[in-house]
C-alpha cells in the first residue's frame, strides 16, 4: 500500500474505510501482563521505545489500557507512534509518521481504537468508544480495504469455540445468519444493521497470569471463560474479556452501523449515531436489542392508501431461546446427534429446531442442562451439555429460517405440492387443450423481517406444463426428421426443464443416453440391483409402456453438507415417458394468439391477485391442523393483507424544443412528440435503404410516408439511396451494405427492410454497422410496414428512433441539480461464450441529460466487473470534460443486475474502486450516489378504495413498512399498467455523499423514468439503466464484441 495516496474524498483526515474506526479485535495479547511476542516472529525490547515487533502480534511494555490494531498488537497510548498492521514504526514528528513497510502510523495523542477485521469488541474500559468526531478526524487510517472473503473466513473460524475445542468441523446451518462483521459507509442515512447483538453472558475478566489452555482444536480458554462468540480462538489471551454468544457483542457492534462516530462528510454528520452502551452482570442473559430504523421516508407528493402482498405475522411467544449443545466425547455423526437429542424430547419439548450444534426452543430451560445418552455403536456414555447462549426476540432474523420451514409444512397440510421453491395446486389446473398446455395455479411464499416487523410475503405464481410427455415430443420429431432424429432431439431438449409427475420434482436435461433403456438395471442406495421398470412399478405403481425409449440425463450441481461431505454425485436418469417439459415453447412465444390465450390466465389483475391471497389466508386460518402447526412456535397469521399509506409523486413537465407540458394521468405523450419539434433534430442528407426485390413496394411507401410526417416533428430528410437486393440472403445484405459504405463514406444511416424474424441476418447487419464499418443502422421487419392503416404511426416512431441514433435529442424533464452526471450500468450474459458476461455503460454528458456516452466491456467469470467499470467511467469523465470544459460535481449511478446477496460486494468493493478513479484527476472529489435498481421483486402494490383493490397510479412510491431494515430503499411504480397487477421497482441507495435526501432520490429516479426515448411515456426503470440494458443485450446477443468507439456518443443501440 502506497502511503502517499490521497485521503478519502470528502472525509478530511481519514482514508478510504471510515468503518475501520470502530472498535474491533485482532490477534494480539493481553494488556495486563508484560508484553511477550507470542504471535509470529521475534520479540523486541520492552523498554517502551518506539521500535516495535515487525511481524504479527508483538507488544511493548506498558501498563496503560491497550487496544489492538489489525493483526498487530496492543500498544500503550503513551507511545509516540503506533505501527498499524504489519509494519515497523519509524520515529515520527508531532503529527505522526509513516510506516514504510506496510501501513500508516497513527498519532497517539488521540484515543486508540481497535481496527482489526470489523468485529465489534465490548468496551475495555469506561472511556472506550466515546471519542469525539473531532478526535477521530485527526487519525490517519489505512487506505487498504479488507477482503470480504477474508472477513467471512474469520467469522466462520471464530463462530463456535466449544465445537472447535472438540475438533469438530461441523458448521451450523444457521451460523452466520444476521451476523455481519463489516460496517457500512457513505449511505447518507442512519447506519443501522441486522447484526445479532446483545443477549450474551457477561464478559468475564481474565485473571492476571491466565494462559490459554491447549485443546484438540487449538488454544482455548478454561471452561469458566469459554464463549461461543467470535472470540480470540487460540490467538493469545484477550484483553479483559471473552465473548459469549455467537454474534457480535452487545451493543457496540450494531450489525452494520457504526459504534464510534466515524469521520463522515458534513452531510452525513447529522445522521450518524452511536449505539448506547450497557453493562451486564455476570451470568445475566438479556433480550437481543432491536435496531433503529434508517431515515428513508420522504414527504413530497399526495398520500394514498396502498395495499401490498405482505401479511402481518404476530408472535405470541415472549422469546426464542438459543442453546449451544456440546457432546462429550465428541459425536461426529450428525444423524447420531439428532437421534440423541430426540431421545430427550421430554426435557426439551416437542417443538425444537436443531442443526447439530445450535438448538432453538420456544421454552426456557435452565441456563446449563446436562443430559446423558449412550452411543449405540460402542455403548459409550455421552454427556450432552445444553447451555443457554442467547435470548432472541421472536421476530429475530435467526428465527426466520425455521419459521419458513413451519410455513412449508402448513402449505403441505393445505394440499399444495412443492415444485421447486413454490407451492402449486394441480387439482385446480387450467387445461388449454387447443395448445396442449396446462397451467397450475400456486403461490410463492416467504417470511421476511422488514422495517414494519415480521411479514409473510405471498405472490401468485403459475407453472406452465405441456400435456405431452418428452416421449411424445420425441415421436413428433422422429416423424418430421428421421435422418437427423438424434441431433434434432438434442437441440430441442438439452437445457429444458422437465417435471416428473410422480414426485413433482423438476430437473434440467443435460444429456440423452441413447444406449440405455428402462430394461437396464441400476444400483439402489441399499446396494440392491433392479431395473427401471421394476423400480417404478414397485415404488409408484407405474407401468412403463415403451421399453426401448432412451434415458434422459440430469447432472446435479455439486452440493455439500456443512461438514464438507458431498450430498449428490453422479447422474440421475429419467424416463421420457414420465417427464413433462415446463415453460412456454419457443414456437408458442412467437404466436400472438396463443400467447394472448395464455396470458389471460397468468397475468391476473390486482383484484384477482388480492382475491387469491385472501383465499389462501382463509384456508390457513380455517384449517385446524395448520393452526396447530403455527401455534407450536406461537405464530399467528393475519386474515387480511397489509394496507398502509404511500405517496403519489408530483407529475413531471416534459420539455420539447419550444413547447413544454405536464404529463397526464397515464404519463403518455405520444401525441405531443409527433406534432411538435424535438429538442434537436439531425438533418438526414445522405442515407441509404436496402430491401429485397419483393419488398420494393413497401419500401417506396415507407419512404413516401417519411416525407409526409417528418415536417411537424422538426425533421428534414432528403431522398435516400435506394438499393434493391436480388434476394434476401444474409450474404447479399452484407456485401451490398459494405459496398455502398465503401463507395459512399458519408452515409449517415443505413436502413434495412427484412423478411421475417431472422436472428442470423440481424446479427450480420449489426456486426457490420456497429463493429466493422461504424454507422447507425435501422432494421425494419416488412410485416411492421405492411398494414396501410398503421403505416403513418409506424413511420413516425421509426423517424424518432432514427433521429436518436444520429445523435438527436427528443425531450427532457427539469432536473434542478447542476453539473450532474447520471450513469446507467447493466450486465448481460454473452450467448456465444459460456459464462462470459458483457457490461453496458451509459453516462450523460450535458445538463439537460440529452446527450449520452456509451461503452461496452466483456469479462470472464473470474474477472471483476469493476475493472471494466473503471475504464468506462474514466472515459466518460474525459468526454464530459471535453463537452463542458469542467468535470461533474455530482455523479449518480444506477446499477442494474445486482441481487440482494451481491449488495455487500458492491458496497465493499465496487464503490471504493470507483472513488479511486477520481484520483486520476488532480483535486477532483465529486459527490457520489450509487443506487441499485432491482426489477425482479416479489412485492406487489395495490391501490385501495374501500374493499376494492386496483392498480396504483404512476408515480406511486412506498418507502416504509415493507422496506429493508439495512438499506435506504424504496419501491417505485413509475409506469402505467394496462394488464396485470402493479409490480414496482425496488431502488436501494447503497452509497450517498451527494446530499440527496430520500425525497431527492425518489424524485430524481422518477424523472429518469421519463427519459427513455424509445417510448413516449414512463418505463419501470430509470432510462440510463434501460439504455445500458439495450446496449449490453445487443453486444452480448448479436455483436459478441465491443462496438466501434466512433458510435460511443450516439444511441445507436435503440
Swiss-Prot record:
Methylated on arginine residues; required for the interaction with Tudor domain-containing protein and subsequent localization to the meiotic nuage, also named P granule. The keyword RNA-binding applies. Its EC number is 3.1.26.-. Residues 749-1040 form the Piwi domain. The active site is at residues 826, 864, 896, 1029. PROSITE patterns: PAZ, PIWI. Pfam families: ArgoL1, PAZ, Piwi, Piwi_N. Its cofactor is Mg(2+). InterPro entries: ArgoL1, PAZ_dom, PAZ_dom_sf, Piwi, RNaseH-like_sf, RNaseH_sf. It is found in: Cytoplasm; Nucleus. Residues 469-583 form the PAZ domain. CDD domains: PAZ_piwi_like (cd02845), Piwi_piwi-like_Euk (cd04658). Its main location: cytoplasm. The keyword Cytoplasm applies. Keywords: Cytoplasm, Developmental protein, Differentiation, Endonuclease, Hydrolase, Meiosis, Metal-binding, Methylation, Nuclease, Nucleus, RNA-binding, RNA-mediated gene silencing, Translation regulation. One of its GO terms (molecular function) is RNA endonuclease activity. GO terms for cellular component: cytoplasm; nucleus; P granule; PET complex; pi-body. One of its GO terms (biological process) is cell differentiation. PANTHER family: EUKARYOTIC TRANSLATION INITIATION FACTOR 2C. Component of the PET complex. Endoribonuclease that plays a central role during spermatogenesis by repressing transposable elements and preventing their mobilization, which is essential for the germline integrity. Plays an essential role in meiotic differentiation of spermatocytes, germ cell differentiation and in self-renewal of spermatogonial stem cells. Acts via the piRNA metabolic process, which mediates the repression of transposable elements during meiosis by forming complexes composed of piRNAs and Piwi proteins and govern the methylation and subsequent repression of transposons. This is Piwi-like protein 2.
